[in-house]
């Protein structure tokens, strides 16, 4: 199956499942992202997904593509995008990928990426698919680990909240 170039957007990758974005396509995209990771000396990516029905299958195919290309995967599972970005920033070379359809209709899914703390454009990944990923040396398969990062995220959020209660006279009036 060929890859439809229209799924590669300025800030992400989005397409209908399974017509435009499916397991075969997403594995090829993962291989291209691995090319970028190798160029930037990134050895591990945090990878998560949202709750869409196609999410788990696409996440597994994506991880398979990364591992085949020698990138270690920390699968953080079903999470929100902010939690994925937290995991990427705090624990994974400031790099991660979120499988998410975002605000699109339920038959869509997609990919948001950050490598070295910078968002990666879908159009850049298309260029890598066209030019670079075919040249990627095949590495020894990497590994996949599974981490529940939610507790670390919650602790970080609560440890950085400064709640200030303001008491003033006549703040509430019973009239």
Positions of PLM-derived features:
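Flexible glycine-/small-residue-enriched beta->alpha junction loops
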Residues: 93-145
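N-terminal small/polar loop signature for handling phosphorylated ligands or for N-terminal nucleophile
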Residues: 44-108
């Amino acid at each position: 199956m060929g890859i439809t170039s229209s799924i590669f957007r300025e800030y992400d990758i989005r397409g209908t499942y399974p017509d435009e974005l499916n397991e075969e396509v997403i594995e090829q995209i993962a291989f291209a992202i691995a090319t970028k990771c190798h160029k930037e000396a990134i050895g591990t990516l945090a990878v998560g997904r949202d709750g869409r029905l196609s999410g788990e299958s696409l996440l597994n195919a994506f991880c398979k593509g990364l591992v085949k290309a020698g990138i270690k995967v920390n699968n953080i599972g079903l999470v929100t995008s902010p939690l994925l970005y937290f995991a990427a920033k705090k624990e994974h070379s400031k790099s991660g990928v979120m499988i998410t359809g975002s605000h699109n209709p339920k038959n869509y899914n997609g990919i948001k990426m950050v490598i070295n703390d910078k968002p990666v454009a879908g159009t850049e990944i298309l260029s890598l698919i066209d030019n670079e990923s075919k040249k990627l040396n095949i590495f020894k398969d990497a590994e996949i680990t599974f981490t529940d990062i939610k507790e670390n995220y919650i602790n970080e959020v609560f440890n950085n909240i400064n709640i200030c209660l303001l008491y003033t006279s006549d703040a509430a009036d019973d009239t």
